[in-house]
């Protein structure tokens, strides 16, 4: 009985020892797991805020899914100065184009070249007159732009403010001329051009008579003419020379030179040519009717206001802005 009692008392003791050993084995692992988990949480950095991606071209968007599959971060678009420079160049061209076409229109409507084209179109072929006048005006515009562009060797700040002062002087002068001008000024200009063209026609007819055969002797006393006159219409040459000489030193030529010195030269050349084409085309198509309807006094006053507006705009635009 005593042996059985000792055997039964050892069994619970063994069980307690086994439980204590198991507890000692498991306890360090549990204690170590806690700090490691804490340290892992501490080492984790906070998630970076999501970047708002700008819409990109199709070629770039096609590359983004491939980069995402590889686990790479999408590349943000890089903006260069080329786009800004191109936008500024386009804006400068548009500004120069609008300035040139508006100034040419208010300067040429009712001008001497306008009446020359109008009167010659009533007497001769309109296309021939338009071609001769436009060739002269295009050549004059290109020469004026070259003269103005040659001044770019001077620092822009000087040419900018000098051209602004010239615009102000032209504007004040045109306003003064317009206010002092009589309502019949356009008619007087028209009559002056008619007299000049009549004189040219008489000289041309006299030349033709001298080139004709002599009735008494039956021989020709022709005056030698230049060979190129046989291939080019005399009307074309007359329209070209009259328009070129009338435009040389005119207010529109000086204005084109001033604009080319401060604006984009290509915009000034294109805008000036388009402006001349509109005015000359209007004169050729309308003829005398438009010449009599146009009030030179009103056009001159409007032109003075436009010139002063360009001069006033220089107070708000920096010379370094590029337009």
UniProtKB/Swiss-Prot annotation:
Domain of life: Eukaryota
Protein name as annotated: Putative divalent cation/proton antiporter TMEM165
Cytoplasmic topological domain: 111-126, 173-227, 288-298
One GO term describing the cellular component: Golgi apparatus
Tissues/organs with expression: Expressed in mammary epithelial cells (at protein level).
InterPro entries linked to this entry: GDT1-like (IPR001727), GDT1-like_CS (IPR049555)
Organism: Mus musculus (Mouse)
Keywords, in A-Z order: Antiport, Coiled coil, Golgi apparatus, Membrane, Signal, Transmembrane, Transmembrane helix, Transport
